[in-house]
């Protein structure tokens, strides 16, 4: 049986050993190699499962994403599900699917992710944003914990996104764009391109008119992720009119 052969492969054992030594960053290429061993017999799924088991959701996503380009879909591994806070400081937080959608796009669930711009951890928080949000939440700010404590990072990121959603009256495309490009730019784009929340333009066209390619792509991908998660969490079809919220 191929699964037995896969599990007994010295490279699979090497990945598990690296996990035990807390050195999983060295297992990325091994997992990608294992994924290619025998696709017909399920090496991609087994490699994605292995990545998940050693806590590397990012490698699991990368293997699954590559497979999806060739019409092989492993949503369980391509869209990991972790707990997100429902209530923080007595306030209701945004739905699980939007926080998962942002986290997948920001870091592929890599708790140690660091961007060239200085954004940190699972939800890619800039240090000045994290400091501000920690103060609002009345918790101690710790730069180290942004990349060493996933729960700390997700709590701060969720609280921050919730404040953006409140600022934009629960209009998801605005809040998502602001999370990526900053609230100031979203105010500018609403002024220049029209405001879909006031029926001046529809959401699809408003997103297409976002000046920055990175932010435009970001909003599209997060909304896409959100709707996949919506389906995965509810197991019910997502209605088109609910696509943007």
What are these regions (language model features)?
Residues 2-5, 14, 21, 26-245:
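Catalytic glycan-binding domains that act on GlcNAc-containing polysaccharides
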